[in-house]
């Protein structure tokens, strides 16, 4: 490139004049559009993304701290996979810290007894059961703009039925009506969400695309707008049913972070959901204690500081319930190791490799135990 072109690429004005011009235009923009309409990224304390705990330590790790404040989150998965349970735990965490939460129950299926058993203060939880999708999203918009609500949950996108479809006859086609509704709503409320610091969680259902031969036929309802506007998308699946004998008492859930704009994506977290009790916090702690080496598992036995504390996972969790002081010490040690940079499956940058390593270790453990017995 010629030398004169290189020199022409830079501003010939002295740096003092450029700074003065920049300050003038910044002042003009703030006068026209309000304070905070433009800022230097390094000067903006609001640009630091704070988080809300999910209620599961493994999922908090996978998300980089929890659900981001002032962002849109989408949680999707098959039926009975734990979507609503996740949001109820988030509501409980917000209320514990003195925050205000709202639940927009478009499915008209909220169980207040179950919510209370998970720690939700149902007396102070704001609940709306809207008649139409437009009504639901308008309520969300007004709650967000009030800047007085910390968390809004919408259950679910699939149940946000457009007014035209409700007022029409059964069997009438309303092609793309829900997708247009969601697209308009996202354009309208996303800016307000960022300004207010309110987190909005949309639950979504899965559908199957017709005629897909190759690739994943699954898709979510409501069009593509939510996929783009969401800062975090979580794919939750039920991978195991927990049993005591023939009695089922819970499920093992796996969450994949399908999208994350505030932390590395594609991490995987697993945790237990107990029927009537929600996420097993002690189960999450035991998983992380084993992965960080605070608790050691040999065969079916778990040991802590050289002493056996339980045979089998369920007995070990029972021991942790009966010994809260030791459990608190274990949690402190686990958090210390995680702070120091210990890599576990939930915060691994190679989640698939970590999952394969864990699976291989699980398979080899019984073989080693049988060799030792022989």
Curated annotation (Swiss-Prot):
Can you name a GO cellular component term? cytosol
> Main location per UniProt?
cytoplasm
Give positions of region: Disordered.
355-374
Q: Where in the cell is it found?
A: Cytoplasm
GO BP, sorted A to Z: DNA recombination; DNA repair; SOS response
Please indicate if the UniProt record lists Membrane as a keyword.
Answer: no
InterPro entries with a match to the protein in the record: AAA+_ATPase (IPR003593), DNA_recomb/repair_RecA (IPR013765), DNA_recomb/repair_RecA_CS (IPR020584), P-loop_NTPase (IPR027417), RecA-like_C (IPR049261), RecA-like_N (IPR049428), RecA_ATP-bd (IPR020588), RecA_C_sf (IPR023400)
Q: What does this chain do?
A: Can catalyze the hydrolysis of ATP in the presence of single-stranded DNA, the ATP-dependent uptake of single-stranded DNA by duplex DNA, and the ATP-dependent hybridization of homologous single-stranded DNAs. It interacts with LexA causing its activation and leading to its autocatalytic cleavage.
| Family membership | Belongs to the RecA family.
Q: What is this protein called?
A: Protein RecA
Annotated organism of origin:
Synechococcus sp. (strain CC9605)
Show the taxonomic lineage: Bacteria, Bacillati, Cyanobacteriota, Cyanophyceae, Synechococcales
